[in-house]
Design a protein with these regions (language model features):
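Carbohydrate-active catalytic/glycan-binding domains of CAZyme proteins
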Residues: 31-364
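Initiator methionine at the very start of the polypeptide chain
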Residues: 1-2, 31
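Intrinsic disorder/low-complexity segments
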Residues: 2-3, 25, 309
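Bacterial N-terminal signal peptides that target proteins for export
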Residues: 2-16
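N-terminal non-cleavable signal-anchor helices
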Residues: 9-10, 25, 30
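Bacterial N-terminal signal peptides
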Residues: 14-26
């Protein structure tokens, strides 16, 4: 080798080393950017189903909005709506299960809410209220309404808070709904909970969480008896957590949970749905631009609570949120204020893909 070649190598080696370090650094930035994204970054622009109007009920601070999105009383003369869970029927229609109460009673009327069923040809809406789920049982009473498809292909709707966790079942999303029974927990004969969220695990067992963040599992059907799996899985240092929503996607168990006093919600994941729940960061915040339309218009509801996910092909594709235009205590009834259920598209496939490093690490 010539002296010239040796000199060239001596000068090139530092340069090549620097380039290699730069490539590693850039790769690290790319990877970090992916893993630093949180749930809130995967909300998608919402298609405008009707038109955007300002001359509808609600505070001007919400912004121009689409009254055909989700489920609402467009006149705000009858109902406040809350909760919200979507299931797609075999015929392609979308069924939303929610609660409603007389708007004349203001937000404080939620204690007398009833479980209702609404239908739409479009995932985003509008959803048409078809009436009470069980009009001849307990006066249709129900709050914290949730719904899911059971392993045998039938359906369940469940309620909590204003009643013990009662479960109703039907072979059709259109009903009729038959009272199956009350959820039971081993060793807790007086168990009564609110904000119950139930799912079917990949192993066929039933799992639920409740307002306090405890996890319960049953290998004997949706009614249980459930086994409490330990203390709350919520992260410490975040006040007033409620409204957990639990599901499985992308090889991980997920919970979103809302801090009512800060208006922020958080996203937690676990490899087995029981242990080692990790706080992945902010899930949503109504002060951020989560409710943005495809034309760039953004709505800012005062509070968005009671999150629920709609899953297709194993990934979340939309989220429903109970939304109110003012502080709850400022909704007095017959005052042009109230609540509805909104639907926002969500890129769950991208989120699950970006969480794959975490999924693979958890499996080791």
């Amino acid at each position: 080798m010539s002296l010239t070649s040796n000199c060239a190598i001596r000068f090139l080696k530092p340069a090549l080393t620097a380039l290699a370090l730069l490539a590693v650094a850039n790769f690290g930035v790319t990877q970090e950017t992916k893993t630093n994204k949180t749930f809130i970054d995967y909300f998608l622009p919402t298609p405008i189903v009707g038109s955007l109007f300002t001359n509808v009920w609600g505070a001007a601070t919400v912004g121009p909005r689409d009254s055909k999105n989700g489920l609402e009383d467009e006149t705000m003369k009858q109902w406040n709506y809350w909760d919200g869970q979507i299931i797609k029927a075999p015929d392609g229609k979308y069924h939303l299960f929610a609660s409603r109460w007389a708007q004349a009673r203001g937000h404080g009327g939620w204690g007398g809410s009833q479980a209702v069923h609404a239908v739409s040809d479009n995932l985003i809406g509008p959803y048409v209220d078809k009436g009470l789920c069980w009009p001849n049982d307990a006066g249709g009473r129900g709050h914290n309404v949730g719904a899911l498809t059971l392993p045998d292909g039938s359906y369940a709707v469940y309620v909590s808070e204003t009643r013990p966790c009662e479960v109703y079942v039907s072979k059709s999303l259109d009903g009729p709904w038959e009272h199956l029974g009350t959820v039971t927990v081993e060793g807790e004969p007086r168990w009564h909970a609110s904000n119950v969220s139930i799912m079917v695990r990949p192993d066929g067992k039933f799992e639920f969480t409740q307002r306090d963040g405890s996890i319960f599992i049953s290998d004997n059907g949706i009614l249980g008896t459930y086994q409490r799996q330990g203390n709350s899985v919520y992260p410490s240092g975040i006040p007033n957590l409620e409204d957990p929503c639990i599901w499985y996607s992308g090889g991980l168990y997920h919970i979103t949970v809302n801090s009512w006093s800060t208006r922020k919600a958080y996203h937690l994941t676990s490899a087995d749905g029981i242990h080692d729940w990790i706080n992945r960061g902010v899930a949503y915040d109504p002060r951020e631009n989560i409710a943005r339309f495809t034309d760039g218009t953004v709505d800012h509801w005062n509070k968005v609570e009671r999150p629920s996910v709609y899953i297709e092909n194993g990934h979340v594709v939309a989220m429903t949120l109970a939304s109110i235009d003012v502080e709850k205590e400022q909704d007095h009834g017959n005052d042009g204020h109230g609540s509805k259920v909104i639907v926002i598209p969500f890129d769950g496939a991208a989120m699950d893909r970006d969480l794959q490093p975490a999924t693979n690490s958890a499996k080791k």
